[in-house]
């Protein structure tokens, strides 16, 4: 499976007096712009995910919706899963993806959870990557039990913007 992992775009700061509860934090105007720019690069690369999974947290759902819009994918194909909540065990993502058994998927989530998943895929005890907000990693998953994968690339939002222009 070709798997893309995308961290949500910049969201309202926790220190902002208007900040809602954690699960309801939303993308800022800058976050929406950065996410759209990253999504345009993904479209140019030609990704075509059969599966789109997101954390149920608002900022991750918004990120997924923007990517759906840019890729021309129906938003109804974006599915929220507790496996992508920040506190979920990385193994839950693998279990969810194994059940779906598709050739290409994208997951929208949070740091350090997505970095923990990448480490889990390599059998590492600690994260060895740092996904930036609106950054994307691409993995080729060879097996789900045990989970094994190769990291193809990891792009920061800045690199995505430069590739998309």
Language-model segments: which ranges?
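Active-site-proximal alpha-helix that buttresses catalytic centers in soluble enzyme cores
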Residues: 2-84, 88-91, 114, 127-134
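Non-DNA-binding regulatory cores of transcription-related proteins
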Residues: 99-104, 111-135
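Beta-strand elements within well-structured catalytic alpha/beta cores of enzymes
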Residues: 2-6, 104-109
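Domain-level recognition of soluble alpha/beta enzyme cores
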Residues: 124-150, 156-160
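Acidic, His/Gly-rich catalytic cores of divalent-metal-dependent hydrolytic chemistry
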Residues: 162-165
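A polyampholytic, Gly/Pro-enriched intrinsically disordered region
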Residues: 97-106, 148-157
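Active-site catalytic microenvironments for nucleophilic, acid-base chemistry
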Residues: 41, 66, 70, 99, ...
């Amino acid at each position: 499976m070709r798997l893309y992992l995308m961290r949500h775009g910049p969201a309202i700061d926790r220190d902002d007096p208007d900040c809602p509860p954690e699960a309801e934090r939303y993308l800022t105007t800058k976050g929406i712009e950065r996410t759209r720019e990253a999504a345009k690069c993904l479209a140019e690369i030609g990704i075509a995910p059969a599966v789109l999974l997101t954390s149920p947290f608002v900022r991750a759902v918004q990120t997924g919706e923007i990517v759906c819009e840019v890729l021309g994918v129906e938003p109804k194909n974006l599915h929220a899963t507790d496996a992508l909540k920040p506190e979920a065990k990385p193994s839950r993502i693998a279990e969810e993806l194994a059940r779906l058994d598709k050739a290409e998927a994208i997951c929208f989530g949070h740091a350090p959870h997505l970095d923990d998943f990448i480490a889990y895929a390599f059998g590492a005890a600690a994260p060895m990557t740092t996904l930036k907000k609106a950054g994307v990693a691409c993995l080729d998953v060879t097996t789900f039990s045990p989970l094994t994968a190769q990291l193809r690339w990891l792009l920061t939002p800045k690199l995505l913007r430069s590739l998309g222009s």
